Every structure is written in C-alpha cells, then in structure tokens.
From Swiss-Prot:
Entry annotated with the keyword NADP: no
The species this protein was found in: Mus musculus
Tissue expression: Expressed in liver and at much lower levels in heart, kidney and testis.
Lumenal topological segments: 150-211
Protein name listed in UniProt: Peroxisomal membrane protein 11C
Amino acid sequence: MALLNRLASALESHRVRDRLIRTLGYCCQLIGGVLVEQCPNRSEVGRRLLVVSAQFNHCRTVLRLFDDLAMFVYTKQYGLGTKEEDIFIRWLSVLSNVTDQLYYPCEHIAWAADAKVLRVDSAWWWTLNTALWTLSLLLGAVKALWTMLKLRQKLRSPTGTSASQLPRSKRRAMEARICSEVLTLLSNLADLANAVHWLPRGVLWAGRFPPWLVGLMGTISSILSTCQAVRAGRQAEADSP
C-alpha cells in the first residue's frame, strides 16, 4: 500500500507524468515498429501501437502549452550566469536557455496550425522547432562532456592537492556528478539522433530512421533520464537533515 501511495503521489507531479508518458510513447513506437516490420501476422497490433505512440506524443505537445512561464522564470533567474565559475559553461547555458525559450512558441504555433487555429504553414514551424531542439541537445551534450572532463581533471590532479587527499564526501560528490553528466550526455545523444532524423531530408541521416529505431533511441533516452532523476532524488534525500 505504501508503494501505491508513493506512486500516486509521484504521478501528481507534472515532470513525473511527462516522463512516464514519454517512456510509454517511445516503448509503443519501438514495439509497434518491430511488429510491423518483422512480424507480418502481428502487423495490425503494431499499427495500433504506433497510433497509441502518436497520441502520447500529441498529449505531451498539448501539455507543453503551459511550460513557457516556467521556462521564462528559469531563464530570468539564471540571467547571464554571473555566478557560474566556468565562462564556457556560462555562455553555453545562456545560449541553451535562449534556444529552449524560443522552442516553446515555435511548437505552439506549429500545433495551432495543425489544429487549423492559425493559417500558417505548420511544416515550416515544425522544422524550426526541431532545429531549435537539435541545437539545444547539441549544447546540452557539449556542456555535459565539458563538465565531465573538468571534474575528472580535478579528481586526478586538483590544484595543490593530491586526489587521495580529497575528503571522501567531496570525492563521492564529484564522482556522483560525473555519473550524472555521463547519463545526461548519453541521453542527449540518443535524442539528438532522433532530432536529426526529423529534420528536412538531405541533412545528415534525416528521414532515414525506421519507426522502431526512433522508438529505441527515445526509449534509451527516457530510461537514462529516469535513472538520473531517481539518482538525484536519492541524493537529495541523503543530503537532507
């Protein structure tokens, strides 16, 4: 019963619910794509799963109509990142925040065009939206890789201190941060593969992924981000008095 209560409580969170919908959507696309391509006698089930996947994706698009304000508050609080020690991370984060802020209205316009609310070319807005997502993922991957390398450098030869002389708690915190950055990097790269696939044909491997491969990349990314969230939650519980 306690587990059921915790699950119910977690699902009240928008982030947890979005993460679950995302994972289910990509899992349905993965399984559905495999059934359609590899199992002719189960192709009808596969097509139904692909429809379910599309509906999950549409659900997330509608829910993101309300994310602009939260993103704006975060961007405003970060500002120009004057508190950031690493100037490279600082400007990567500023550019990433601007990209993410522009992503939402572009998606809203594309959605409204598909819904016949606005008379504009939805394909153009979806392309711009995907390009912004691709840039955001690329910036996130570079940021995670840079942070990971800097932390590893500190562990190996921190200024004026040998690695063995670092306090155990600080060393564990740095190792946990490195693990978190690795998960972020891999998750962003998996999403980046899909983002490029959804760009106009002629751009790298755009349009070449079968549905099951899109589902696989998305499922990997979703599982990695879920693992990262669970680790962060446990770390927060451990740090709380």
